[in-house]
């Protein structure tokens, strides 16, 4: 693996929160994915999201990060990471999760679908 990538294994909730808070970007490169909690958690902690354009990921990220289609787009991902994004984009990602995907709104939507 690249020296900038670490495989950490299982982490506690506290460890995950610390990792998110100390990370500028969160990458979700799934080929199939519903609505990944990990992207929501990372954005809530201020990570700028980068995700594949599949299922629920674009709904979560919106215009607060980068969406890509295939492995061929990884040059675009690299350029995005090196573009100098910072505090403003981090705050936008956090604000989007709080306003659109907070737990109360998610529970209400589930209740609406059940009724």
Short names for language-model regions:
Residues 48-51:
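Short hydrophobic beta-strand element within catalytic cores of glycosyltransferases
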Residues 17, 36, 40-44, 55-59:
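Short alpha-helical segment that forms part of, or immediately flanks, the ligand-binding pocket
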Residues 1-10:
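Nucleotide-activated donor-binding/catalytic signature segment of Leloir-type glycosyltransferases, i.e.
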Residues 10-14, 71:
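Structural motif corresponding to alpha-helix initiation and N-cap regions
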Residues 31:
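Aromatic "clamp/platform" in nucleotide-sugar-dependent glycosyltransferases that forms part
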Residues 72, 85-115:
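A charged, aromatic-enriched C-terminal amphipathic alpha-helix characteristic of glycosyltransferases
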Residues 18-23, 28:
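Short alpha-helical donor nucleotide-sugar binding micro-motif in glycosyltransferases
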């Amino acid at each position: 693996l690249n020296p900038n990538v670490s495989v950490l294994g299982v982490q506690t909730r506290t460890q995950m929160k610390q990792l998110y808070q100390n990370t500028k970007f969160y990458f979700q490169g799934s080929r199939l994915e519903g609505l990944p909690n990990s992207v929501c958690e990372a954005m809530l902690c201020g990570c700028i999201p980068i995700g594949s354009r599949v299922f629920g990921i674009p709904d979560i990220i919106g215009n607060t990060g980068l969406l890509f289609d295939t492995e061929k787009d990884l040059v675009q991902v690299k350029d995005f990471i090196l573009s100098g994004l910072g505090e403003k984009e981090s705050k936008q990602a956090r604000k989007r999760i709080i306003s659109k995907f907070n737990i109360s709104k998610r529970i209400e939507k589930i209740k609406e679908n059940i009724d």
